[in-house]
Amino acid sequence: MKIKLLLISFILAANALGAVAQVSKTYFVSKPGTLISMMTEDEANSITHLTLTGKINAEDFRHLRDEFPNLKVLDISNADIKMYTGKAGTYPNGKLCVYMPNFIPTYAFSNIVDGVTKGKATLEKIILSEKIKNIEDAAFKGCENLKICQIRKKTAPNLLPEALADSITAIFVPLGSSDEYRYKNRWEKFAFIEGEPVETTLQVGAMGKLEEEILKSGLQPRDIN
């Protein structure tokens, strides 16, 4: 039986002011390390949902971590991660480091500030490629709002210490592959759901009923986990 997870954002009318509007962008990166040069600072600041294709490296991950202040959803499922050697990657304090191809870099979305590891607080969902080999140390450590990690790969990539945030609610994996993940080292504590997540945003007014809004969206309350 295919299990689906429905993610619902409740936008109460009384609290609608001040919410960040969804801004979705897709970029093809032809040369690794050049993502940030493809947009203005204002564009980078406004993006909430970002899809990347082409070639990226640890420099691009550093920019994604440090220069996209409203980034919530990142899809790199069709991007190739290229090797990078240098000081402009994700490792804290500009340490010289070798970043291997198709590895999610160490400290990809976390950093050490005053001796404390802090994750990217805005990040809620990440979609990873079927080519991923490793998720490196502390890649998503401290990403307190990261709830969904979707991986296109049928065999579990190597998961290094503290690579994923404890806040993750579910790991979405391809159909028939949950056991492959469940029995791999360091993956044991996560919940796995096969297939694609189903997402919707519901606006419920002060007098509105949640069940009615769910039905209006074309879904059934029983589909919600």
Q: Across the structure, where does each feature detected by a protein language model lie?
A:
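Structural signature of tandem-repeat unit edges
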Residues: 23-31, 48-56, 71-87, 91-103, ...
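Acidic Gly/Asp/Thr-rich repetitive segments characteristic of extracellular carbohydrate-active
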Residues: 27-46, 201-221
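Short, aromatic/basic amphipathic alpha-helical patches
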Residues: 63-66, 161-164, 179-190
